[in-house]
Amino acid sequence: YNEGTFLAEITREGILKYLNQEIPYQISVITDKIIKSNNYTIHQKILVQTLSHKKIILGKNGHSIKAIGSYSRLEMEKVLKCKCNLFLKVVLKKR
Protein backbone atom coordinates (compact mmCIF):
# COMPACT_ATOMS: atom_id res chain seq x y z
CA TYR A 1 0.00 0.00 0.00
CA ASN A 2 1.19 3.46 -0.76
CA GLU A 3 -0.26 6.49 0.99
CA GLY A 4 -2.59 7.38 -1.89
CA THR A 5 -4.10 3.90 -2.01
CA PHE A 6 -4.59 3.88 1.76
CA LEU A 7 -6.37 7.26 1.68
CA ALA A 8 -8.54 6.10 -1.23
CA GLU A 9 -9.63 3.11 0.87
CA ILE A 10 -10.73 5.46 3.65
CA THR A 11 -12.95 7.33 1.18
CA ARG A 12 -14.29 4.05 -0.20
CA GLU A 13 -15.19 3.03 3.35
CA GLY A 14 -17.10 6.33 3.69
CA ILE A 15 -19.02 5.60 0.49
CA LEU A 16 -20.02 2.15 1.74
CA LYS A 17 -20.96 3.56 5.16
CA TYR A 18 -23.26 6.28 3.83
CA LEU A 19 -24.76 4.56 0.80
CA ASN A 20 -25.34 1.09 2.27
CA GLN A 21 -26.20 -1.31 -0.55
CA GLU A 22 -27.48 1.35 -2.97
CA ILE A 23 -24.30 1.34 -5.04
CA PRO A 24 -22.58 -1.71 -6.45
CA TYR A 25 -19.00 -2.37 -5.52
CA GLN A 26 -17.80 -1.32 -9.00
CA ILE A 27 -16.93 2.14 -7.70
CA SER A 28 -13.27 2.97 -7.49
CA VAL A 29 -11.53 5.82 -5.72
CA ILE A 30 -8.27 7.25 -7.03
CA THR A 31 -6.03 9.66 -5.15
CA ASP A 32 -4.86 12.17 -7.76
CA LYS A 33 -2.69 14.41 -5.65
CA ILE A 34 -1.40 14.71 -2.09
CA ILE A 35 0.17 18.01 -1.06
CA LYS A 36 1.93 18.09 2.30
CA SER A 37 2.76 21.36 4.00
CA ASN A 38 1.56 22.27 7.51
CA ASN A 39 -1.43 20.10 6.69
CA TYR A 40 -2.49 17.69 3.95
CA THR A 41 -4.41 18.64 0.83
CA ILE A 42 -5.81 15.55 -0.86
CA HIS A 43 -7.52 15.43 -4.26
CA GLN A 44 -9.47 12.27 -5.09
CA LYS A 45 -11.72 11.05 -7.90
CA ILE A 46 -14.65 8.71 -7.32
CA LEU A 47 -15.14 6.75 -10.55
CA VAL A 48 -18.66 5.46 -11.25
CA GLN A 49 -20.13 3.34 -14.05
CA THR A 50 -23.39 5.19 -14.74
CA LEU A 51 -24.96 8.62 -14.46
CA SER A 52 -27.50 7.24 -11.98
CA HIS A 53 -24.65 6.08 -9.70
CA LYS A 54 -23.16 9.57 -9.92
CA LYS A 55 -26.50 11.09 -8.87
CA ILE A 56 -26.77 8.69 -5.92
CA ILE A 57 -23.26 9.52 -4.71
CA LEU A 58 -23.84 13.26 -5.02
CA GLY A 59 -27.22 12.96 -3.30
CA LYS A 60 -29.95 15.56 -3.10
CA ASN A 61 -28.33 19.01 -2.98
CA GLY A 62 -24.95 17.34 -2.50
CA HIS A 63 -25.80 15.92 0.94
CA SER A 64 -24.37 12.44 0.29
CA ILE A 65 -21.03 13.58 -1.10
CA LYS A 66 -20.73 16.09 1.76
CA ALA A 67 -21.31 13.35 4.38
CA ILE A 68 -18.85 11.02 2.63
CA GLY A 69 -16.26 13.80 2.42
CA SER A 70 -16.66 14.84 6.07
CA TYR A 71 -16.41 11.27 7.34
CA SER A 72 -13.39 10.52 5.14
CA ARG A 73 -11.60 13.74 6.10
CA LEU A 74 -12.05 13.09 9.82
CA GLU A 75 -10.78 9.51 9.44
CA MET A 76 -7.77 10.75 7.46
CA GLU A 77 -7.01 13.34 10.15
CA LYS A 78 -7.03 10.57 12.79
CA VAL A 79 -4.61 8.44 10.77
CA LEU A 80 -2.32 11.24 9.56
CA LYS A 81 -2.50 13.12 12.89
CA CYS A 82 -2.89 16.53 11.26
CA LYS A 83 -5.50 18.69 9.52
CA CYS A 84 -6.61 17.58 6.06
CA ASN A 85 -8.37 19.32 3.20
CA LEU A 86 -10.15 16.75 1.07
CA PHE A 87 -11.45 17.50 -2.42
CA LEU A 88 -13.68 14.85 -3.99
CA LYS A 89 -14.80 14.75 -7.61
CA VAL A 90 -17.31 12.21 -8.94
CA VAL A 91 -16.41 11.15 -12.48
CA LEU A 92 -18.16 8.89 -14.99
CA LYS A 93 -15.80 6.07 -15.99
CA LYS A 94 -15.10 5.91 -19.70
CA ARG A 95 -15.90 2.50 -21.14
Language model: regions and residue ranges:
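C-terminal-of-GTPase-core extension/linker across diverse P-loop GTPases
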Residues: Y1-R95
